[in-house]
Regions:
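Small-residue-biased structural context
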Residues: 1-146
Length: 146
C-alpha cells in the first residue's frame, strides 16, 4: 500500500506537471489547446483539494481530535486562497489574456510551493502515523485521474 505521503506528494507533482504544460502552451499554442490544458490543470487541482477536504482532513481530525486551529484548518484556508487565484486564472483564460494567466500562475505557484511543503513534511506524515491501515480505504476514494 502506498502511504498518504507518497500518494498525495505524487499527485502534487502531477499537478505541477500539468501547470508546466499550460505554461509551455501559453507561448504559442492555439487557444483551444491552451484552454484544454488549463482545464486539465484546474480539474486536477480541484480534485486534489476536494479529496483532502472531504475525505483526508475529516479522517485525520477524527483520528487526532485536531479541528479548529489545527493543521487542517490552515490547509483549508490556503485552499480557499488558491481557489481564488485559480478563479482569476480562469477569467484570464476566458478573456484570452495569456500574460494575465501566466502572471496569476506565478502567484499560484508561490502559494502552492509554500502549501505543499507544509503538507508533504508535516501533515501527510502525521496522516501516515495516525490513519495507519485506514489510509487504504481513504485512498480508494480518490477520484480517477486524467
Amino acid at each position: 500500500m502506498t502511504t498518504a505521503t507518497q500518494f498525495l506528494t505524487d499527485d502534487h507533482r502531477d499537478c505541477d506537471a500539468l501547470w508546466a504544460e499550460v505554461e509551455r502552451a501559453a507561448d504559442d499554442a492555439p487557444a483551444a489547446e491552451l484552454r484544454a490544458g488549463f482545464e486539465r490543470f484546474s480539474a486536477a487541482m480541484a480534485r486534489h483539494f476536494d479529496f483532502e477536504e472531504a475525505v483526508l482532513f475529516p479522517a485525520f481530525e477524527a483520528a487526532t481530535g485536531m479541528t479548529q486551529g489545527g493543521p487542517t484548518f490552515v490547509m483549508r484556508s490556503e485552499h480557499q486562497q488558491m481557489r481564488r487565484v485559480l478563479d482569476g486564472m480562469a477569467a484570464a483564460m476566458a478573456a484570452g489574456e495569456r500574460q494575465a494567466l501566466l502572471d496569476a500562475g506565478d502567484t499560484l505557484l508561490m502559494l502552492v510551493q509554500q502549501h505543499n511543503v507544509k503538507e508533504e513534511h508535516m501533515l501527510y506524515p502525521a496522516c501516515d502515523a495516525h490513519l495507519g491501515q485506514g489510509w487504504g480505504a481513504l485512498q480508494g476514494r480518490f477520484p480517477a485521474t486524467r
